[in-house]
Amino acid sequence: MIKQALISVSDKTGIVDFAKSLSDLGVKLLSTGGTAKLLADAGLPVTEVADYTGFPEMLDGRVKTLHPKVHGGILARRDLPEHMQALEAHDIPTIDLLVVNLYPFVATIAKDDCTLADAIENIDIGGPTMLRSAAKNHRDVTVIVDPADYAVVLDEMKANGNTVGYATNFRLATKVFAHTAQYDGAITNYLTSLTDELKHGSRNPYPATLNMAFEKVQDLRYGENPHQSAAFYRDIVTPAGALANYRQLQGKELSYNNIADSDAAWECVKTFDAPACVIIKHANPCGVAVGNDSADAYAKAFQTDPTSAFGGIIAFNREVDEAAAQAVAKQFVEVLIAPSFTDAAKQVFAAKQNVRLLEIALGEGHNAFDLKRVGGGLLVQSLDAKNVQPHELRVVTKRHPTPKEMDDLLFAWRVAKYVKSNAIVFCGNGMTLGVGAGQMSRVDSARIASIKAQNAGLTLAGSAVASDAFFPFRDGLDVVVAAGATCVIQPGGSVRDDEVIAAADEHNIAMILTGVRHFRH
């Protein structure tokens, strides 16, 4: 039974109402510093920990709760007579409920003006110590680190005579250990990232020890293949526009491949300002287009490769209305993603309950790192977030691109970034015309992209081509020109750049170098 609670929080969300409810249930309240003042100002009967222990707060608040009368009351096992006799001998009441959250270390180091001294002062000592003590003794002590759990604990106390069951206590304890591990991990990441221990700003983005924490969203039916087990995890702090924040409106449970392909589709479609549609198959765009609205963009994207679009993942960067829904509903689709769906659009898909509809807010989608596991290790890199600006482009041919060609080139370049290497993308009039992906030679990707366009009945005459990396020889360029391309955008950087540029001049096409490569593996 909960008779006494100790409350000490940095995040004071909902704490007054929670403490009042505890007091109404007859629970004695102990508290520290600012929390105690807040509760007292609200008219609640609260005892300061300093008065409770008979030992004042000291060292500018660094020592508040590190006292046997606090930790003895938390750690004593109620089922061991010798523990309870020791408490009685030293006049230590039990503390049955601990409500603590920690100094905002992560928020502090995120500030531009944060100094190392600021960071150090926001490393909580007493809080984690109490939390770990209570979590260790969870059979007898209820511990809350998250304000979201206030209501759950109160409801259980009211229903069970101020008692919280073991299952809830165990869940709350595991939450504490996860929280303190993340907290210590953030401190380690920060301190080991400092290149000059005297300067907060001198930080290596890749700390000597990398700690990362994720929380499980769900177990998956299987992994990439049926014989593989799998689960989906998300970052503890998830950017607003991240796929992991999806809201599923209808459809079957998402699979491992659904999630992976949906992320590729969503990240690609968000890069466009105009209404856009991206169709993904096996993590590669097989159709991308911009249009007047979602329905128009979808119609153009679907034209690129109707065969590959079968069973694909489709993403929009605008609301899906009835017209777009009716167009998509004519095809077999695994997942449809958009910022929102009109009621009429939802009604269209109500007759196709296997189609998974996902709503995700537009916005930044990824945290700082891109990760790839290798045997016994982890490759960590910054995101490929580079978008070339017009002033960074360099025309290297005698003929310059026309304004229309420039628009097509920039569109093609944006798409190529999301195609598996080696990538060749033909585009024109705001849509992909042919996509060559994932080939070991660039010339083969060029040939495949050309064949894809022919199979779809699309002309490549006057088209623009993007290559995610340089042309090592002129052969790839010759293939795209023979197919009908009149302008090319590529990074450059080959030892044979002069030969490739000369070939472009020979064909009288325009060529732009970006100086940026977009390998994608």
From Swiss-Prot:
GO terms for molecular function: IMP cyclohydrolase activity; phosphoribosylaminoimidazolecarboxamide formyltransferase activity. Its EC number is 2.1.2.3, 3.5.4.10. CDD domains: IMPCH. SUPFAM superfamilies: Cytidine deaminase-like, Methylglyoxal synthase-like. Residues 1-145 form the MGS-like domain. Pathway: Purine metabolism; IMP biosynthesis via de novo pathway; 5-formamido-1-(5-phospho-D-ribosyl)imidazole-4-carboxamide from 5-amino-1-(5-phospho-D-ribosyl)imidazole-4-carboxamide (10-formyl THF route): step 1/1; Purine metabolism; IMP biosynthesis via de novo pathway; IMP from 5-formamido-1-(5-phospho-D-ribosyl)imidazole-4-carboxamide: step 1/1. Belongs to the PurH family. This is Bifunctional purine biosynthesis protein PurH. It comes from Burkholderia multivorans (strain ATCC 17616 / 249).
